[in-house]
């Protein structure tokens, strides 16, 4: 009997607390709402003065979310005064609880919007909401990147698949197995970009001789290209290239038994030395420009050249410091005696056509984030590559 009375009393206390809480909430929303809005608006206004580069703020806790996709409501668009900030805050309290702000440097006015925050794997939903609300972009907080509502990135997201061009012949950056499965450092880079976009990924075969034409083809066969593509001024004249995600430089592969023969380019630049290269890429260009006296042979399939060198059908392969260690570690007949003294110094990046600035911004944002959070270094370690950033 005593236990039942105790439980009844506890239920009554709980009920009274709930009723009291609802009454207080009602009083706050009806009687004190303007005081609350004013207090929050004052805090947001002060916060904005210290953050001229823009922000997204959870006004319920006055905290800054580090992840999410921020999109503004049309109802609060164009609010740029302390008085209008009250309207924005009131709208935010009635909806999602987020306020975004940014300084228009052209007119010196700070603009505020009630904002919805989407999970970062819901970019398609965020872009649709933005389009329905007459917005021009969505902002990915973790990447600090704007995604235009209308653009190439939006097209990829709507399609649901990222199309990536790659030669598939460049271990360990991009290689296609006979089964059709692609693997490699560059492949994992693009998988991360696709994950950030919330889409699937499909690889499209290209080749070194046709790479530039394939990137520039109309209609496009893929969105951009990866896999051992060195950043050069010549490529940037006609196409866009991302920031570098891998250091690179020209070196050689030779038979291990001959490794003492080759100490410099001069040792290779002789008629009796047969140098083999793949066609159409920078390896062939380097050989033609720097080894005029050597006997240069062109072989169509890049991935077959190391074995041909090991078998004696060529003496030297012009390759890169990203590729050479893979073959040396997997074939004891081969050596890379000048690996620590590359003939050139450069970086590898993502190649795309001009006009896709939104794609370039997105790719660069992912690369920057991977450098910042250590995932790019871990990917280097996985493939035995030297991290130089």
Regions found by a protein language model. Give the residues of each.
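C-terminal motif of bacterial Sec signal peptides marking the signal peptidase cleavage site
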Residues: 24-27
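Ligand-binding clefts/hinges and TM-proximal coupling segments of bilobed small-molecule sensing domains
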Residues: 152, 282-297, 335-340, 367-389
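Short glycine-rich His-centered loop
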Residues: 159-184
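Alpha-to-beta junction loops
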Residues: 163, 198-200, 217-227, 272-274, ...
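Beta->alpha turn/N-cap motifs
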Residues: 166-170, 204-209, 220-232, 255, ...
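Acidic, polar ligand-binding/catalytic clefts
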Residues: 187, 191, 195, 200-267, ...
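A ligand-binding cleft/hinge motif common to bilobed small-molecule-binding domains
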Residues: 210-213, 228-236, 285-289, 310-344
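Periplasmic-binding protein-like
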Residues: 246-254, 321-368, 386-389
């Amino acid at each position: 009997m005593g236990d039942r009375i105790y439980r009844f009393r506890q239920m009554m206390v709980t009920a009274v607390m709930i009723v009291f809480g609802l009454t207080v909430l009602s009083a706050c929303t009806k009687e004190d709402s303007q005081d609350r809005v004013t207090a929050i608006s004052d805090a947001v206004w002060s916060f904005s003065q210290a953050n001229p580069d823009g922000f997204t703020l959870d006004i319920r806790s006055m905290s800054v979310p580090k992840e999410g996709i921020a999109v503004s409501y049309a109802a609060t668009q164009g609010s740029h005064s302390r008085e209008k900030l009250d309207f924005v805050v009131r709208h935010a309290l009635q909806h999602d609880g987020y306020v975004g702000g940014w300084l228009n440097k052209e007119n010196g006015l700070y603009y505020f919007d009630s904002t919805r925050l989407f999970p970062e794997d819901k970019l398609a939903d965020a872009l649709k909401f933005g389009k329905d609300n007459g917005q021009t972009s969505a902002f990915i907080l973790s990447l600090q990147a704007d995604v235009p509502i209308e653009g190439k990135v939006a097209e990829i997201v709507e399609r649901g698949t990222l199309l990536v061009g790659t030669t598939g012949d460049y271990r360990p950056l991009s290689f296609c197995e006979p089964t059709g499965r692609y693997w490699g450092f560059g492949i994992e880079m693009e998988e991360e970009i696709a994950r950030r976009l919330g889409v699937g990924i499909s690889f499209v075969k290209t080749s070194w001789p046709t790479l530039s034409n394939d990137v520039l083809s109309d209609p496009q066969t893929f969105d951009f290209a990866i896999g051992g593509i060195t950043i050069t001024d010549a490529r940037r004249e006609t196409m866009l290239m991302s920031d570098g995600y891998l250091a690179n430089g020209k070196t050689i592969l030779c038979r291990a038994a001959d490794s003492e023969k080759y100490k410099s380019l001069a040792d290779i630049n002789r008629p009796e030395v047969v140098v083999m290269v793949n066609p159409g890429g920078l390896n062939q260009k380097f050989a033609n420009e720097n080894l005029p006296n050597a006997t240069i042979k062109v072989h169509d399939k890049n991935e077959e050249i190391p074995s041909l060198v090991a078998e004696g059908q060529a003496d030297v392969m012009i390759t890169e410091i990203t590729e050479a260690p893979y073959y040396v570690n997997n074939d004891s007949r081969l050596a890379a005696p000048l690996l620590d003294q590359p003939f050139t110094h450069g970086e590898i990046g993502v190649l795309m056509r001009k006009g896709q600035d939104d794609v370039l911004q997105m790719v660069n944002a992912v690369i920057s984030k991977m450098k910042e959070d250590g995932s790019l270094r871990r990917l280097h370690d996985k493939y035995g590559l030297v991290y130089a950033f």
